[in-house]
Amino acid sequence: MGFDYALVHLKYTIPPAVLLTWLYRPFFTKLDVYKVGYLVSIAVASTIPWDSYLIRTGIWSYPTHVIIGPKLCDIPLEEVFFFIIQTYNTSLLYLLLSRPTFQPVYLNTERGAARRQWRYMRLAGQVFFLALIAWGWRCIRHGGLGTYTGLILVWAGPFLLMLWSLAYQFILALPVTNTALPIFLPTLYLWVVDTLALRRGTWVISTGTKYGLHLWDGLEIEEALFFLATNALIVFGQLAFDNALAVLYTFPHLFTGPSLLPSPVLLMRALLTPCSKYHDARIKGLDEAVNRLKRKSRSFYLASATFPGPLRADLLLLYSFCRVADDLVDNASDADEARAWIAKMRKFLNNVYSDKLPQSVVHSQICDDFPPSTQSALLQLPATKLSPQPLEDLLHGFEMDLAFQQGPIIRTMEDLRVYSERVAGTVAQMCIQLIFYWYPSTLDTEEKNVIVAAGNSMGVALQYVNIARDIEVDAQIGRVYLPLNWLSEAGLSYDDVLKKPNQAQIQTLRKHLLNHAFSVYEKAKDSIERLPIEARGPIRVAVESYMEIGRILRSEQYQVKAGRATVPKSRRIMVAWRTLNSK
């Protein structure tokens, strides 16, 4: 009896598990627990028979003085724990590294010329893994020095072949931060741990079943292969799981209303769905939505990574629609063209929410009335999950912007509040509607309405910050959102602001508006804690990331890009991290 192997865990495997758990804790969802638990179960169930065989045939052994004693199928409990902790650690590293990536946009329909290329890549991988299995089988048949290598390849090869065949598209298309990095980082770490363990004799490989080659001094080539293969299995398993989830949640025409914790059978159905059935327009819409958010709002782009998958997709599509609608109006050559765009969008919404019109009519109107670059944003709007009134109010907000052509429209703080409710409060309301769609709550209708109203107020607060930030930019396009009665009290006219938006009196009014923003924010922020738990942290990040702009404006220590105050990326990341860990 001894504690050498247990000490390996205490020193080298448990500390990374604690660190990774702490780092990922703010993001953990029920789905993540399900994914990790599912893979741990498979890892243990598939490894025990193989490892037991290695021990019973003398290929692998553990001196009695290094283990505590209890065994399962001849395997020391420390080794069984190793199966669990390795799978857990590698899975959490994968989850952390892949979190910023919106994976559904990496799905591919494999149509046209790309189809043959994808098939060749799939076949190349299959041939590679089949060759490894065949070589492993040959090593086992011949016995001797290649036995351990052969057993590794024959055991791991079929799993890798299966996972590759199911998820090769994701494995090849996703960034290396989602694929290679979560394989090689833990592999390199375990190579170092294994080197120390083999030198101390914590576990021993029989000399007649190994080649005697070393990757470096103290690390047997077979052990290096084992850790590379097992970490590849874990990451391939996570990728296959996420591939299935992406298919389930991206294509409602294939899977209507999938569960947030889908069964293994449903996951397999998703993986076996032919790529030719994927909807090109859906993937394009999501891809354009991600790029729009990345270009137009770095704060919300960072916050979007904290939202769970299906909700994240709908929020991206909602933002994309709002952004496109706003740009159509703002970029119009004159007021008549802008009014025409609003009329077309109103017609679009009437068609979408009409019970009598078929989808083909909606599609035709979009193709006839809107530029190709904007069509996917309209086609993919998650209208069935939203009530029509906030969208109609958003159009009223655009109409208020057009009224600037005739002169100032924001005469009092009440006018500014109404405007902000229409252009920002409405968006916040729709975000909350999407949250309650994906994560039903036990709250009654009245309580939900209170939360929606608070969301509307929070949208107003964010819009106040936006206006305070963009005083100079807005002046360049002939708009002043500061109330006229404020300007009068400060001894300024509307034209004074248009001509010189950086004068000292305006800086004072900016701070005054920010005070209003933070006052509204303080009254509304507690309602966030009544949202479903899956959305609380992400919504806090979205709000705090934007309110940080207000804090920087208050401090007057900010960078200016294109006439706007910006928050450095490092500070945005720190705000997001602090917010996620605050409650």
Swiss-Prot record:
<dbReference type="InterPro" id="IPR019845">
    <property type="entry name" value="Squalene/phytoene_synthase_CS"/>
</dbReference>
<feature type="transmembrane region" description="Helical">
    <location>
        <begin position="173"/>
        <end position="193"/>
    </location>
</feature>
<dbReference type="InterPro" id="IPR017825">
    <property type="entry name" value="Lycopene_cyclase_dom"/>
</dbReference>
<dbReference type="InterPro" id="IPR033904">
    <property type="entry name" value="Trans_IPPS_HH"/>
</dbReference>
<dbReference type="GO" id="GO:0016117">
    <property type="term" value="P:carotenoid biosynthetic process"/>
</dbReference>
<feature type="region of interest" description="Phytoene synthase">
    <location>
        <begin position="250"/>
        <end position="583"/>
    </location>
</feature>
<dbReference type="GO" id="GO:0016872">
    <property type="term" value="F:intramolecular lyase activity"/>
</dbReference>
<feature type="transmembrane region" description="Helical">
    <location>
        <begin position="120"/>
        <end position="140"/>
    </location>
</feature>
<dbReference type="GO" id="GO:0016020">
    <property type="term" value="C:membrane"/>
</dbReference>
<keyword id="KW-0812">Transmembrane</keyword>
<dbReference type="Pfam" id="PF00494">
    <property type="entry name" value="SQS_PSY"/>
</dbReference>
<comment type="pathway">
    <text>Carotenoid biosynthesis; beta-carotene biosynthesis.</text>
</comment>
<dbReference type="GO" id="GO:0051996">
    <property type="term" value="F:squalene synthase [NAD(P)H] activity"/>
</dbReference>
<comment type="pathway">
    <text>Carotenoid biosynthesis; phytoene biosynthesis; all-trans-phytoene from geranylgeranyl diphosphate: step 1/1.</text>
</comment>
<dbReference type="InterPro" id="IPR008949">
    <property type="entry name" value="Isoprenoid_synthase_dom_sf"/>
</dbReference>
<dbReference type="InterPro" id="IPR002060">
    <property type="entry name" value="Squ/phyt_synthse"/>
</dbReference>
<keyword id="KW-1133">Transmembrane helix</keyword>
<comment type="function">
    <text>Bifunctional enzyme that catalyzes the reactions from geranylgeranyl diphosphate to phytoene (phytoene synthase) and lycopene to beta-carotene via the intermediate gamma-carotene (lycopene cyclase).</text>
</comment>
<keyword id="KW-0413">Isomerase</keyword>
<keyword id="KW-0472">Membrane</keyword>
<keyword id="KW-0511">Multifunctional enzyme</keyword>
<feature type="transmembrane region" description="Helical">
    <location>
        <begin position="151"/>
        <end position="171"/>
    </location>
</feature>
<dbReference type="InterPro" id="IPR044843">
    <property type="entry name" value="Trans_IPPS_bact-type"/>
</dbReference>
<dbReference type="GO" id="GO:0004311">
    <property type="term" value="F:geranylgeranyl diphosphate synthase activity"/>
</dbReference>
<feature type="transmembrane region" description="Helical">
    <location>
        <begin position="221"/>
        <end position="241"/>
    </location>
</feature>
<keyword id="KW-0808">Transferase</keyword>
<feature type="transmembrane region" description="Helical">
    <location>
        <begin position="3"/>
        <end position="23"/>
    </location>
</feature>
<feature type="transmembrane region" description="Helical">
    <location>
        <begin position="75"/>
        <end position="97"/>
    </location>
</feature>
<protein>
    <recommendedName>
        <fullName>Bifunctional lycopene cyclase/phytoene synthase</fullName>
        <ecNumber>5.5.1.19</ecNumber>
        <ecNumber>2.5.1.32</ecNumber>
    </recommendedName>
</protein>
<comment type="similarity">
    <text>In the C-terminal section; belongs to the phytoene/squalene synthase family.</text>
</comment>
<feature type="region of interest" description="Lycopene beta-cyclase">
    <location>
        <begin position="1"/>
        <end position="243"/>
    </location>
</feature>
<keyword id="KW-0125">Carotenoid biosynthesis</keyword>
<feature type="transmembrane region" description="Helical">
    <location>
        <begin position="35"/>
        <end position="55"/>
    </location>
</feature>
<comment type="similarity">
    <text>In the N-terminal section; belongs to the lycopene beta-cyclase family.</text>
</comment>
<dbReference type="GO" id="GO:0045436">
    <property type="term" value="F:lycopene beta cyclase activity"/>
</dbReference>
